[in-house]
């Protein structure tokens, strides 16, 4: 079983929330 992917980093505040 491959190693689990790293946790997703927090999106920057500039990220558009669609």
Swiss-Prot record:
Broad class of the protein's primary localization: secreted
Keywords in alphabetical order: Secreted
Expression across tissues: Expressed by the venom gland.
GO CC entries: extracellular region
Subcellular location: Secreted
Record's protein name: Peptide 2699
Organism: Tityus stigmurus (Brazilian scorpion)
Upper lineage: Eukaryota, Metazoa, Ecdysozoa, Arthropoda, Chelicerata
